[in-house]
């Protein structure tokens, strides 16, 4: 890379995540040690700004009526969130090396639905199975979704505006809001079946032991 003039920007997207909520050595090896390795590489090639892909999931779910913003601390207490917090701390520890941007991303999906939970939801709701109409609780649980093309535009804008950004900044790559599961259910089933399909809301005591 140095032989070809170095690199103005380093975009660190690599990371490990699974849906078990259990600890895994890859969180430390990939998300923490891997970030440390990329930071050292970025210093060697003289980057103008380091862009670190963190996640809104590093922050605790906000209370009703509250939102997550750029000042929200990354204090969620499950393995993936803890590893992202450690990554953010590494960025802060190395800020004297080069300017950096911590980008906390929403749930990223594509036209191919390459976000596993979203795929499972839509695949279930559009199938002819006993549970295809079931939603947990009142369907008010929600996730902020962002299309991968919008994420690309976001990163390009950060690069374009790099000289006007603080040396170290935290940015949320997310819509200004969220999509509830009941909203998602209604949209997906109406589009697929061409009509409204009534959902079945599962009571809390049937879900929580």
Tell me the role of every PLM-derived stretch.
Residues 1-30, 41, 59:
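NAD(P)H-binding glycine-rich loop region in Rossmannoid oxidoreductase-like domains
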